[in-house]
Design a protein with these regions (language model features):
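Hydrophobic alpha-helical connector segments
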Residues: 85, 99-128, 151, 177-184
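Hydrophobic/aromatic-rich alpha-helical bundle segments in the mid-to-C-terminal region
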Residues: 131, 144-148, 152, 166-217, ...
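Helical hydrophobic small-molecule/effector-binding pocket
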Residues: 113-135, 156, 185-192, 196, ...
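An amphipathic alpha-helix adjacent to DNA-recognition modules
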Residues: 34-45, 49, 54-55, 66, ...
Length: 239
């Protein structure tokens, strides 16, 4: 749990340092603004947990942080902006988790397995945020390029680790293809969605469904065995 628990502090520190690097120093006013923004996002998550992700009420969010709604717009100019900031926060947090898992294991299949396991731990710990990140639960919401960037960086980490697994003959090269990685992510997303739908409120360690991840990854690795012929491919020809 240490990886997940350290994320909030590290994200705040990242924002803090970003302002410092831009302006040369962080003033008390800037620090207060950053803290207030984070408090607003925390309150938004709490409201979404109670009322539904798509039912975010900014009046209620403002009340919980001691602001009037017009004052909240000094920090976020719309409800969409709050969703966008939460989306960016979530994928930044997930990127930190992937980085810790993959670099800590030195890449390769063991690192990918740990990264997928920590991804499910994150989703179980942050079910409301996970809905926003991986489903289209808010009609019309499209994340900004900036908010989506951390998701793409995380995917690049997985691609690199999967390529290393293929180079080390831990998996067949087809596993490191775009289709192979898409299949891996679909497998993990399936376990996550089953847990979310059928075990609301059940933690990572207690979940019967999350426990299916390890055998599912075993089956994936067996399917993409490095013992298969190099030219083997599971994908239907498009010719």
């Amino acid at each position: 749990m240490a990886i997940v628990e350290s994320i909030a502090y590290r994200l705040f520190y990242t924002l803090f340092m970003a302002v410092r690097e831009t302006n040369g120093a962080v003033t008390p006013r800037e620090r207060h603004r950053l803290q207030t923004r984070e408090e607003i996002l925390d309150a938004a998550l709490a409201v979404m947990a109670e009322q539904g992700v798509a039912a975010l009420n900014l009046t209620e969010v403002a009340r919980r942080v001691g602001l009037r709604q017009p004052s909240l717009y000094q920090y976020f100019d719309s409800r969409t902006a709050v969703y966008d900031a939460l989306f960016e926060r979530g994928w930044r947090a997930h990127y930190e988790i992937l980085t810790a898992a993959i670099t800590g294991q030195g890449g390769g299949w063991a690192a990918v397995r740990l990264a997928m396991r920590e991804t499910l731990r994150f989703a179980a710990a942050q079910p409301v945020l996970a809905q926003l990140l991986v489903t289209r639960v808010v009609p019309g919401f499209v994340p900004s390029d900036r908010a989506y960037a951390a998701s793409l960086r995380g995917l690049d980490l997985v691609r690199t680790a999967m390529a290393a697994a293929a180079e080390r003959a831990e998996l067949h090269p087809a596993a490191a293809s775009e289709n192979g990685i898409a299949l891996l992510l679909a497998l993990v997303a399936g376990v996550a969605s089953q847990h979310s739908a059928n075990e609301p409120g059940v933690g990572f360690a207690e979940s019967r469904l999350i426990a299916l991840l390890d055998p599912a990854l075993d089956m994936y690795a067996a399917y993409f065995s490095p013992d298969r012929p190099p030219a083997w491919t599971p994908w239907a020809s498009t010719d």
